[in-house]
């Protein structure tokens, strides 16, 4: 699995384990992700996948490196997905 595939899987798992916020984002704590059996089986290096997703501005969390136990309560936010360009153009045209 390459980095893009791992980030896509991470998004799916945050949707599954997290809670939807009013702005369309999803939040989950690092501890919930790290201790989930399904995530443990999918991600060989969860922290590395999180860092790659943060670098691409797909997720946000405080700090650079998350460690089990120490950072279990750190919230990870999956940013809302912007609408596809066609939908955005249609919305702008109807305004």
UniProtKB/Swiss-Prot annotation:
Modified residues (N-acetylmethionine): 1
Pfam family, any one: Costars
Membrane spanning stretches: none
Cross-referenced SMART domains: Costars (SM01283)
Gene Ontology cellular component list: cytosol
Family annotation (InterPro entries): Costars, Costars_dom, Costars_sf
Keyword tags: Acetylation
Family the entry assigns: Belongs to the costars family.
Protein name, entry field: Costars family protein At4g33640
């Amino acid at each position: 699995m390459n980095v893009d595939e791992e980030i896509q899987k991470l998004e799916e798992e945050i949707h599954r384990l997290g809670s939807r916020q009013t702005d369309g984002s999803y939040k989950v704590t690092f501890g919930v992700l790290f201790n989930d059996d399904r995530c443990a089986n999918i991600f060989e290096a969860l922290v590395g996948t999180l860092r790659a997703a943060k670098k691409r501005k797909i997720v946000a969390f405080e700090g650079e490196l998350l460690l089990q136990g120490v950072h279990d309560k750190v919230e990870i936010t999956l940013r809302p997905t912007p609408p596809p360009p066609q939908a955005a153009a249609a919305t702008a045209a109807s305004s």
